[in-house]
Amino acid sequence: MSNPIYNKHIISISDLSRSELELIVSTANDLKQNPRPDLLKNKVVASCFFEASTRTRLSFETAVQRLGGSVIGFPDSGNTSLGKKGETLADSVQVISSYCDAFFMRHNQEGAARLASEFSSAPVINGGDGSNQHPTQTLLDLFSIYETQGTLEKLQVAFVGDLKYGRTVHSLTQALSLFDCEFHFIAPAALSMPDYIIDELKAKGCKYTLHDHLDGVLPNLDILYMTRVQKERFDETEYQHLKSSFILNANMLEGVKENLKVLHPLPRIDEITTDVDSTPYAYYFQQAKNGVYARQALLALVLTNEFGDK
């Protein structure tokens, strides 16, 4: 069985080909339908969070345990040698990776996961590095899109809110650009999509439009991807100005396509009002649950040869 992801570092979504993304999505679907509680028996996975996380850490550790593996690590680097004694990231990674079969990490500095992969003896999986990349979030997003739309091809996708610092939208845009999707980027000028993402879309010939409001965009969409303005990346005055730039409520969803699904990487603050939760379009809580299956799929492929092309 051919598995091109076996023992591979997963640092950026751009490290994965279209066929590899499809393999991960199909494996996630397989594991959701057919649990494999002993697949990672005797495997040890390090879960090392140098930056705070709730959903990513818990869903990843749940994924390991539901596949029969064991987890070591820490939820906060404050009490580690790196945090307390000034140990370098490179030294920490070399030591920790010698204890495990895979190394899952989140860090607040861009490029930290790539650096870790140069010193790790185990495959590194990036759980988010600063405002740069968040590939495992992208995998659960792709799985959720496939699950609700039946395809990843030629969809109309809008990203709303913080497109500058929101690493989830960077990774997902790069992934969906492989599937001939059309993009709508809806953000204030201060939070617009980075130039390097726009340049990549131009190079691939992907269609995209820029908007400064939601009006007129919603009726054509298959996927509406909302994001929060990340308070931790702004001073208080700027945050208060930007946080309510784009708010979605249930009334705005009148006249949208029946297959539309609203996604959000969570946590939400006030950018999606709670009356949206009870509509048939809300899918963000199911999306979060899919994080377990997407991360199970990635672990299964990185650590075993049980899945792949026959």
UniProtKB/Swiss-Prot annotation:
GO biological process, alphabetically ordered: 'de novo' pyrimidine nucleobase biosynthetic process; 'de novo' UMP biosynthetic process; amino acid metabolic process
Positions annotated to bind carbamoyl phosphate: R55, T56, R106, H134, Q137, L266, P267
Transferase recorded as keyword: yes
Binding site for L-aspartate: K85, R167, R228
Domain of life: Bacteria
GO cellular component: cytosol
UniProt keyword DNA-binding, yes or no: no
GO molecular function: amino acid binding; aspartate carbamoyltransferase activity
Pathway: Pyrimidine metabolism; UMP biosynthesis via de novo pathway; (S)-dihydroorotate from bicarbonate: step 2/3
Catalytic activity: carbamoyl phosphate + L-aspartate = N-carbamoyl-L-aspartate + phosphate + H(+)
The EC number(s) this enzyme carries: 2.1.3.2
Broadest EC class assigned to this enzyme: transferase
Keywords: Pyrimidine biosynthesis, Transferase
Subunit: Heterododecamer (2C3:3R2) of six catalytic PyrB chains organized as two trimers (C3), and six regulatory PyrI chains organized as three dimers (R2).
Protein function: Catalyzes the condensation of carbamoyl phosphate and aspartate to form carbamoyl aspartate and inorganic phosphate, the committed step in the de novo pyrimidine nucleotide biosynthesis pathway.
Record PANTHER family: ASPARTATE CARBAMOYLTRANSFERASE, ORNITHINE CARBAMOYLTRANSFERASE, MITOCHONDRIAL
NCBIfam families per record: asp_carb_tr, PRK00856.1
Family: Belongs to the aspartate/ornithine carbamoyltransferase superfamily. ATCase family.
Protein name: Aspartate carbamoyltransferase catalytic subunit 3
Protein's organism: Shewanella halifaxensis (strain HAW-EB4)
Gene: pyrB3
